[in-house]
Amino acid sequence: MNGSRATNAALLATLKAEWSEGSDVSVCVPAPYLGETAAALDGSGIQWGGQDCSAHSSGAYTGEISAAMLAEFGCTHVIVGHSERRSMHGESDALVADKAAMAMASGLVPIVCVGETLSEHDAGDTDAVVIRQLDAVIFKLGAAIERCVVAYEPVWAIGTGKTASPQQAQAVHARLRALLCSASTFGDSIRILYGGSVKVDNAAELFAQADIDGGLVGGASLKAADFVAICRAAR
């Protein structure tokens, strides 16, 4: 829940001016700014998406935003299961899977987030947690999981002063890759993004890992120069 009309306009203008082809970029913005984002990025080659969607197609769900509504604004992607949604809104694995299915039904690519908390990490439960979370989506979608993007967010490495090394991140990505390959013949081509405090100074080493296909960039995306540099590192 960051940004304003003025700061967003400046950020998007810089991104559009400085971005060049070589990496796929999707900017997921707060819903009130979707119209302005679509206008700003139209024809640029940069895609845009939503930060969440409802598990329902329509109806009396005041305050929720359907995947179909996002699609009407030209969105190509939507984030589901972000760690903040799971922790602050109590979203279950099953609900996240339902949201992913609804996104796909509306022609969007769901960016499915998985990741363990600090206590789960310290208890050695990383594998069990991320596999459980991703398994719920695979169970719901079946082989259609190949149309998703997966994002690994080590929650313990976000705002805690602790960091996941590229090697630690790669180890988890490799386990997620193995699970995806067991569910789809296209498992090797499903993109797995890393979302644990991606910054200019660690992006290149992270993206050099075999199973890290890009980044789910948080705070660094609020600074246009940093975000452009990270996008360049993903080429």
Ranges and model annotations:
Residues M1-R235:
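Active-site loop-to-helix "anion-binding N-cap" substructures in soluble metabolic enzymes
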